[in-house]
Design a protein with these regions (language model features):
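C-terminal transmembrane helix and the adjacent membrane-cytosol boundary/short C-terminal tail
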Residues: 154, 231-268
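Transmembrane alpha-helices
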Residues: 135-139, 171-205, 231-232, 236-237
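Periplasmic/extracellular loop-to-transmembrane helix junction in inner-membrane transport proteins
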Residues: 26-80
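Short cytoplasmic-facing helical segments at TM-TM junctions of multi-pass membrane proteins
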Residues: 148-190, 214, 218
Length: 268
């Protein structure tokens, strides 16, 4: 019964999709002299069957795997770069308040820029290629993650850190046993947010500034008015986004919820 309830939204979505497709039929223009050549009908919204058939064709030809792997690669490169630099800069900035006061407005301004601004700049500076999606993802991921990590470090017990300096505890040990455990909650929250936004930003950047990838395929599908293909690639983006949300982001958020974790342990 529970499994059926989970399938109900999907069934309703497919039925509404099919209904919208039936209502979107338009009559095309006549060809030639119009004699004996009736105008052909076309759909603005393809049926689920047409979309699935086009998706199967993309998978069988290898086009789906090729472009999807490129999108994932670019997104992961930008994600890793953004998280790494956020961690490297966030820790010292959280410990040094004057440095944080100087950098915080700059990072906040960077965070305020929408992805389309970075895409425009990078298309001029770097041209179409892998650089644009990677750096756009970095620009979207770095600011919130940096501020999150710096906030976590600033919230550490500074008296304990002062004791480590007095007793000359090695910095590597302080980092491993005090700093990293203390900011783990903030780091996991940053990773959860970054994973959620990376996929969307990567596809958007590819739409404008990449020679390949899922976003680039969407661009050409809409240019060619190939609606089944456009919907098929859209379904790919949604499927990967849902998989990331359910398989990675939600478990990370649940790991950050002490009440839920406590409840599970009590029941066990």
């Amino acid at each position: 019964m529970r499994c059926f309830r989970k399938l109900v939204p999907l069934i309703v979505l497919l039925l509404l999709w099919w209904l919208a497709s039936s209502l979107s039929v338009r009559q095309g223009q006549e060809t030639g002299d119009g004699v004996g050549q009736p105008a052909t009908a076309y759909r603005l919204i393809p049926t689920p069957w047409e979309t699935g058939r086009e998706g199967a064709r993309l998978a069988s030809t290898g086009e789906l795997c090729r472009h999807l792997s490129l999108t994932v690669f670019r997104g992961m490169c930008g994600l890793v770069l953004g998280l790494a630099i956020a961690l490297i800069l966030g820790v010292p900035c959280g410990l040094l308040r004057p440095v944080m006061e100087v950098l915080s407005p700059l990072v906040t301004a960077m965070q305020s820029c929408p992805p389309i601004i970075w895409i425009s700049f990078l298309l001029v500076w770097a041209g179409i290629g892998n650089v644009v999606p990677m750096l756009v993802v970095f620009a979207a991921v770095f600011p919130p993650c940096f501020l999150n990590v710096a906030q976590g470090v600033a919230g550490l017990d500074h008296r304990l850190l002062e004791m480590t300096r007095v007793y000359r505890v090695p910095r590597g040990r302080v980092l491993r046993q005090i700093v990293l455990p203390g900011i783990s909650r903030f780091a996991v929250a940053s990773l959860s947010f970054a994973l959620g936004i990376t996929w969307k930003v990567t596809a958007t950047a590819e739409f404008f500034g990449a020679p390949s990838g899922v976003g680039e395929r969407i661009y050409w599908s809409q240019r060619e008015m190939n609606m089944p293909r456009l919907f098929a690639w859209t379904a790919v983006i949604i499927a990967v986004g849902v998989a990331l949300e359910l398989g990675v982001v939600q478990p990370l958020r649940e790991a950050l919820d002490p009440e839920k974790g406590g409840g599970d342990s009590d029941r066990s």
